[in-house]
Amino acid sequence: EGYFDGIGATGFFLGKPEVTGATQEGLSAAIENARQRIAARIRDTIGGAEGEIAAALMVGVRAGIPEEASEALRRTGLYHVISISGLHMALVAGTVIGAIRAVMALFPMWAARHPVRKYAAFAGLVAITAYLVISGGEVATRRSFLMLSVMLVALLFDRAALTMRNLAISAIVVLLVTPHEVVGPSFQMSFAATAALVGAFAW
């Protein structure tokens, strides 16, 4: 039960714990510090609940969202929007790929001699990798990254991107890395929705 709940160990304190500050060092600490700095900059620039929501969308820092705003998002069924997942990953990848292809289209002679689609796909892959890292890499974010990256890698190797085979590869990787996710509604709904979209595209 603990494994499926994501609990690796439990314990207790003999006395009241004293918070002395973060002591983590290395790359993970540098990434977390960068996330917090970006979130603080967004809050200072926008301010209010809007700034907190923007910070959640950009770097996945949701702790500062006021309870009133969170409750309003829940009542309207929009709370999932601030959880970085497939929608956000697709927007990042689509924006970068579209921008790269638009820029390369300005140089038709050069574009005719180079694999523009592969360059754009690679740029999109780099962009969503950076977004995964800076957003904290939660479960839904990692799953969305995996599905998108499989499709982009397929483009790099001149394969069809939107196929059930690529979706199956993504599912197999998820099952190998985190098998307990298969029983969760998030995994089931995201893969079911993606399968429906891929099937509709093929039809």
Task: Name each model feature, range by range.
Residues 1-80:
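Membrane-interface helix/helix-cap signal primarily in integral membrane proteins
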